């Protein structure tokens, strides 16, 4: 998972998911953009990492926006995941350029505690900077979900922290 600026904010690393969620929410005052890189054949790993944080952010009065490529979130899954059904919004079937643009606009508004978007390609430095600036303005958290094939390796890494889900087997 890639975090912009978040990794350098605290000298101690929270040891529990609850503490991590609380720390992320407290630090969201400056905005946060993270990239979650996961194997296409192991999407559950990304869910295990994100659901505690999403549940915690769901306690805010703001919406959670999911920008999904094709999949539609089911009411049953949202409820079973412990997410607030009344605060989850979804827009599906967006092309990648529209997903990035929509993420930037949504993050900037401040209406969303978290904006989650799926992108297949790595971001340019300019695109990443635009997302970070928008998250800071809107006091929001943005997650870029990027599935990769098992044999694909990242070409480069932004300065920050990137945790690949295959490290958690």
UniProtKB/Swiss-Prot annotation:
Site (Essential for degradation by Lon protease): 169
Pfam family, one: SulA
Region of interest called Lon protease binding, as start-end residue ranges on this chain: 162-169
Induction (UniProt): By DNA damage, as part of the SOS response.
Keyword check for Repeat: no
Modifications the protein undergoes after translation, according to the UniProt entry: Is rapidly cleaved and degraded by the Lon protease once DNA damage is repaired.
Domain of life: Bacteria
Region (FtsZ binding): 106-112
UniProt keyword terms in alphabetical order: Cell cycle, Cell division, DNA damage, Septation, SOS response
Classification via SUPFAM superfamilies: P-loop containing nucleoside triphosphate hydrolases
GO BP terms, alphabetized: division septum assembly; DNA repair; negative regulation of cell division; SOS response
UniProt keyword Cell division present: yes
Subunit structure: Interacts with FtsZ.
Role: Component of the SOS system and an inhibitor of cell division. Accumulation of SulA causes rapid cessation of cell division and the appearance of long, non-septate filaments. In the presence of GTP, binds a polymerization-competent form of FtsZ in a 1:1 ratio, thus inhibiting FtsZ polymerization and therefore preventing it from participating in the assembly of the Z ring. This mechanism prevents the premature segregation of damaged DNA to daughter cells during cell division.
Alphabetical list of HAMAP family matching this protein: SulA
Family in the record: Belongs to the SulA family.
The protein's name in its UniProt record: Cell division inhibitor SulA
